């Protein structure tokens, strides 16, 4: 009787091995489910990013307003006749008087460039 019990216990162990540790066992399935969940999160984030980029491309292709907004914010461009006003945060020291001569030096017209002699 004891021998029969041991044989059945060994057979049970042999049957359980592929279920838990085999090629398609539970540990492998759990790991694959975790990988699928991570990939779904990544895909959702990329899908949202693609939607935002598509909207931006659509705006840039159809409207002048988006191009103008981008030129103003990223390149600092202004329309002719506009005045740039820079509001300093509280506690920021005011620019010194030394900045005025630099601004006037920049506004002086340059002499025309002469071509190099050959």
UniProtKB/Swiss-Prot annotation:
Compositional bias (Pro residues): 109-118
Keywords annotated in UniProt: Cell cycle, Cell division, Cell inner membrane, Cell membrane, Coiled coil, Membrane, Transmembrane, Transmembrane helix
Region feature Disordered, mapped onto this chain: 88-118
GO terms of biological process kind: FtsZ-dependent cytokinesis
Stretches with biased composition (Polar residues): 95-105
Coiled-coil features, chain-numbered ranges: 28-62
Record has Coiled coil as a keyword: yes
Transmembrane spans: 4-21
Cytoplasmic side: 1-3
Source species, domain of life: Bacteria
Membrane topology: Single-pass type II membrane protein
Keyword field contains Cell inner membrane: yes
Pfam families on file: DivIC
GO cellular component: cell division site; cell septum; plasma membrane
InterPro entries reported in the protein's UniProt record: Cell_div_FtsB, FtsL/DivIC
Protein function: Essential cell division protein. May link together the upstream cell division proteins, which are predominantly cytoplasmic, with the downstream cell division proteins, which are predominantly periplasmic.
NCBIfam families: PRK00888.1
Known partners and oligomeric status: Part of a complex composed of FtsB, FtsL and FtsQ.
PANTHER family found in the cross-reference section: CELL DIVISION PROTEIN FTSB (PTHR37485:SF1)
Protein name in the entry: Cell division protein FtsB
Native organism: Bordetella pertussis (strain Tohama I / ATCC BAA-589 / NCTC 13251)
